[in-house]
C-alpha cells in the first residue's frame, strides 16, 4: 500500500523525507507523507539513522485505507500519478522567506511585480516585451519552444545559489555571467549592470557550474537571441530554500528599469546585418598608475586590482 516515487528534474530525496504531499489521481486527490523505508525508531532502532539516502529508499504513506497494492488500485491510485509537495512557506518580519519551491515561484512573483509597476507608471515601452512563464525548465526543455522569430533578447529570471565558492547573495540582484552551458551575452549583461549602477540597485556577479537556465534551452533549440540571466540569491536551493525580500524587490526594479530603457541593439531587428555598428568588446587598456620603476613602498592604492 506504500507508493514508490521518482523525482521530476533534480531534487534530493534527503529533502523529501518527512514532506507532506498530495497524490492526484483520476478519481480525485489523496493526502500522504513521504517517509524513509525504515521510519520508526521503535521498530528499527539505529537502522533508521544508518539507512541510505535516495529515492529508492523513500515511499509515500497514503492517508487512506491502503495497506496493499490491491487497495491502492481500488482507490484509483495508478502508475504515473503526479505528486505535489507542500511548500510550507514562512514569511518572517525581518524580510526573510523560507519555503520550498522558491525556485522559481519567487521569479514568477518578481515578474508580476514588474508588470504591476509598468501598469502603474503607464509609460510606453520602447519595444514590445513578452512575459513568458515556463513549466519545464527542470527537465531541460524550458524556453526551447516558446519564442517567436521577432524576439531579439531573452532575459531569464531565476535563482542564484548562496553557498561557499559562490558570489550570489540573498540581498540585491545577482547577475549571472555564465552557467553550465557557457557565458551569456556580454553586451546585454553589461547593460543590466549599468542599469543597476544608474538606479542604485545593489548587485553582484556570479558563475554557476552546475546550473542550466531557460536561456540555454532556447539557444540549444536554435533561437538567435541575446541572452542574460538575472537572479535572486537562494540559500539551500532545491531544498529548504530561503531568500530575502530585498533581493526580490531589487530584481523587480531591475526588470522594470530594463523594459523602460532605450533599445541598445537596433541592428538586432534586422534578420541579416552588416559589420557597420557591429557590437564589440572594449579593447583599450585599463588606466593604471603603476609603472616599472616604482619602489615597493610607493605603490599607489589605485594600482591594486581586486
List where the protein language model places each region:
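N-terminal hydrophobic/helix-forming segments and targeting peptides
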Residues: 1-306
Amino acid at each position: 500500500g506504500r507508493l514508490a516515487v521518482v523525482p521530476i528534474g533534480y531534487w534530493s530525496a534527503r529533502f523529501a523525507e518527512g514532506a507532506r504531499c498530495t497524490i492526484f489521481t483520476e478519481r480525485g486527490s489523496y493526502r500522504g507523507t513521504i517517509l524513509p523505508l525504515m521510519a520508526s525508531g521503535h521498530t528499527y532502532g539505529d537502522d533508521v539513522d544508518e539507512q541510505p539516502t535516495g529515492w529508492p529508499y523513500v515511499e509515500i504513506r497514503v492517508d487512506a485505507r491502503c495497506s496493499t497494492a490491491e487497495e491502492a488500485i481500488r482507490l484509483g491510485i495508478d502508475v504515473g500519478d503526479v505528486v505535489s509537495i507542500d511548500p510550507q512557506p514562512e514569511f518572517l518580519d525581518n524580510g526573510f522567506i523560507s519555503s520550498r519551491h522558491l525556485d522559481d515561484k519567487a521569479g514568477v512573483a518578481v515578474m508580476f511585480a514588474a508588470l504591476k509597476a509598468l501598469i502603474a507608471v503607464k509609460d510606453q515601452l520602447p519595444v514590445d516585451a513578452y512575459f513568458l512563464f515556463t513549466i519545464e525548465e527542470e527537465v531541460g526543455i524550458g524556453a526551447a519552444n516558446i519564442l517567436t522569430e521577432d524576439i531579439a533578447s531573452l532575459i531569464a529570471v531565476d535563482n542564484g545559489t548562496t553557498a561557499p565558492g559562490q558570489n550570489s547573495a540573498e540581498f540585491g540582484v545577482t547577475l549571472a555571467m555564465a552557467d553550465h552551458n557557457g557565458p551569456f551575452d556580454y553586451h546585454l549583461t553589461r547593460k543590466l549592470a549599468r542599469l543597476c549602477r544608474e538606479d542604485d540597485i545593489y548587485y553582484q556577479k556570479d558563475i554557476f557550474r552546475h546550473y542550466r537556465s531557460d536561456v540555454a534551452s532556447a539557444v540549444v533549440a536554435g533561437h538567435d537571441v541575446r541572452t542574460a540571466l538575472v537572479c535572486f540569491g537562494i540559500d539551500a536551493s532545491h531544498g529548504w530554500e530561503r531568500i530575502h525580500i530585498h533581493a526580490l524587490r531589487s530584481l523587480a526594479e531591475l526588470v522594470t528599469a530594463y523594459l523602460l530603457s532605450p533599445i541598445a541593439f537596433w541592428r538586432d531587428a534586422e534578420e541579416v546585418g552588416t559589420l557597420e555598428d557591429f557590437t564589440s568588446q572594449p579593447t583599450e587598456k585599463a588606466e593604471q598608475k603603476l609603472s616599472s620603476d616604482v619602489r615597493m613602498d610607493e605603490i599607489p592604492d589605485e594600482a591594486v586590482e581586486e
